[in-house]
Amino acid sequence: MITIKKGLDLPIAGAPSQVINDGKSITKVALLGEEYVGMRPTMHVRVGDEVKKAQVLFEDKKNPGVKFTSPVSGKVIEVNRGAKRVLQSVVIEVAGDEQVTFDKFEASQLAGLDREVIKTQLVESGLWTALRTRPFSKVPAIESTTKAIFVTAMDTNPLAAKPELIINEQAEAFVAGLDVLSALTEEKVYVCKSGTSLPRSSQSNVEEHVFDGPHPAGLAGTHMHFLYPVNANNVAWSINYQDVIAFGQLFLTGELFTDRVVSLAGPVVNNPRLVRTIMGASLDELTDSEMMPGEVRVISGSVLTGTHATGPHAYLGRYHLQVSVLREGRDKELFGWATPGKNKFSVTRSFLGHLFKGQLFNMTTTTNGSDRAMVPIGNYERVVPLDMEPTLLLRDLCAGDTDSAQALGALELDEEDLALCTFVCPGKYEYGQLLRDCLNTIEKEG
């Protein structure tokens, strides 16, 4: 067991009941283009086209051969683009049950499949996009290989579901997915989990590792740091546990599996719980009548790293297993910093709230202050468990010093790894975006 001592479990109210419920009927789904780092689409469909489930919607010009497929059967009703014609979303109205089918195999055959057979089926089905590289967090090139694949079978994000509930419900498919991954990599598959019991693969190159401690103990970046540190030459891939289940279902049934179990939770959700829905589901429909009155913000993903689900982005993200809802923090509080703060949370124990152990807070979207200088008071060191100098790294990200940032470990990181630094920062810096700008520069300039 690897125990993480530094970090922070956010004491936010509205945790979900850990029972899986059926979600609302969904009539619209979407693929969100901006989720895929560096992707430039070649469109295969236009508004008005009828599509089958698993039919190709677009391919990536920059990553030749990588295909993005429809999670449902229906009709393309919107292709939304932003500034410089960046693809925002392809929206599909759900209709019918036609689908593209693929080869299916017996469970005993999976570990012995040729890598090319596995790769071809994953690419054609669109499930290849479930894999992401580290560094850079991009969909891997089709011809690339890796010596390490990390399966994130735990989740320490605030308000998250317990993965073991979902995995044990789909035990056969999860093991089948691990067998597929074991044949896909040159060396090891690392299944990173909490202390709970999970279905196990019998393949010798599939290893289980237990992590314990506060968030970010459940992030792929943390697991890689301790088990297989990445750099420009050591590239690892990561995948979440629900996509492993989808891999298994694809090879066992020959059909694209797009079910998702997500946590619908937050301080303003009437009945926080786990709901079964589909990949890319409309969050306007999924959250309809689920929230308390007032102005709220629906977030696809965690409250720390998720995206504001509004307009053309109001759909469940490809890599998101949560839907979080917070009240918009519009109210101004005169001299709020000078009040005792019984109902306020503070990492630095500036308010009385820290005296009440176990207290949960109705957190909002407010940043509790305006932008200001980066102040190194030890906050970052409290929440970063990795063997690096977070204050120096964050300073370099602010200054745009990519050489120094790379030397300090920036290539190991993804936006989610710095989310707690953003949360505890007195200067209100968005370190995730600064990291992405740095990584883009490093990749472009070599």
From Swiss-Prot:
Entry GO MF terms: oxidoreductase activity, acting on NAD(P)H, quinone or similar compound as acceptor
Keyword Chloroplast annotated: no
UniProt-listed Enzyme Commission number(s): 7.2.1.1
Catalytic reaction equation(s): a ubiquinone + n Na(+)(in) + NADH + H(+) = a ubiquinol + n Na(+)(out) + NAD(+)
Pfam families in the cross-refs: NQRA_2nd, NQRA_N, NQRA_SLBB
Keywords associated with the record: Ion transport, NAD, Sodium, Sodium transport, Translocase, Transport, Ubiquinone
Domain of life: Bacteria
Gene Ontology biological process terms, A to Z: sodium ion transport
InterPro entries xref list: NqrA, NQRA_2nd, NqrA_C_domain, NQRA_N
Record note on quaternary structure: Composed of six subunits; NqrA, NqrB, NqrC, NqrD, NqrE and NqrF.
Family statement drawn from the similarity comment of this UniProt entry: Belongs to the NqrA family.
Function noted in UniProt: NQR complex catalyzes the reduction of ubiquinone-1 to ubiquinol by two successive reactions, coupled with the transport of Na(+) ions from the cytoplasm to the periplasm. NqrA to NqrE are probably involved in the second step, the conversion of ubisemiquinone to ubiquinol.
Name of this protein: Na(+)-translocating NADH-quinone reductase subunit A
Annotated organism of origin: Vibrio vulnificus (strain YJ016)
